[in-house]
């Protein structure tokens, strides 16, 4: 169960999460500042890039630019560790990167997708939300990643971390597309 104090001003706050989960009350917090995007950056939501007339316009935006903080406050303490379930270090490395990406963590902690998803089982966003929520609520502990996250990969065989990361991000993107079959 998530702490209601994480829900500030109508949205879940990853930036404030570390204050609540530190195993030591006197833990030092390090603020990591990232450069924000310029107003007319190629990555800016306001910028329109017409690369091809055949492309459909964007039907849905996951989050407005102002909801994507590029800075975070994290405790100096170690976060949740992931158990290696037999050559799954490629999964663990990718999951750690995704879990500690502030915009993604904010979106997952908001539960915005799972509140409207009609296919919780088999939905990569719902599966990833469960993992990120569990990882952020268990700092300093070792947790076992869900087997559903690596369902498309061979168990007991070493795989490529980049390939797994691309598979996961692609499956999460497809889960956001209206009318697309869940992966």
From Swiss-Prot:
InterPro entries membership: Papain-like_cys_pep_sf, Peptidase_C19, Peptidase_C19_UCH, USP_CS, USP_dom
Question: Chief localization class?
Answer: nucleus
Please cite one Gene Ontology biological process associated with this protein: protein deubiquitination
Q: Where is the USP domain?
A: 80-183
Under the heading PROSITE patterns, the entry gives: USP_1, USP_3
Going by the UniProt record, its keywords in alphabetical order are: Endoplasmic reticulum, Nucleus
Q: Which GO terms describe its molecular function?
A: cysteine-type deubiquitinase activity
A Gene Ontology CC term for this entry?
endoplasmic reticulum
Localisation per UniProt entry? Nucleus; Endoplasmic reticulum
Protein family membership: Belongs to the peptidase C19 family. USP17 subfamily.
Recorded protein name is Ubiquitin carboxyl-terminal hydrolase 17-like protein 23
In the UniProt record, the gene name given for this protein reads USP17L23
């Amino acid at each position: 169960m998530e702490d209601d104090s994480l829900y500030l001003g109508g949205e879940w706050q990853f930036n404030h999460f570390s204050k609540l989960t530190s195993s030591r009350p006197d833990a030092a917090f390090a603020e990591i500042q990232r450069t924000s995007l310029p107003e007319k950056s190629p990555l800016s939501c306001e910028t329109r890039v017409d690369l091809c007339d055949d492309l459909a316009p964007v039907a849905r935006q996951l989050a407005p630019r102002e909801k994507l903080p590029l800075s975070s406050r994290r405790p100096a303490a170690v976060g949740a560790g992931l158990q290696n379930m037999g050559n799954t270090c490629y999964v663990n490395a990718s999951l750690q990167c995704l879990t500690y990406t502030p915009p993604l963590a904010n979106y997952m902690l908001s539960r915005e997708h799972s509140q409207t998803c009609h296919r919780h089982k088999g939905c990569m966003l719902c599966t990833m939300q469960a993992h990120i929520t569990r990882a952020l609520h268990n700092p300093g502990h070792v947790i076992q990643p869900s087997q559903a996250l690596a369902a498309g990969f061979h168990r007991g065989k070493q795989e490529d971390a980049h390939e797994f990361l691309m598979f996961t991000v692609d499956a999460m993107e497809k889960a956001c597309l209206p009318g697309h079959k869940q992966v």
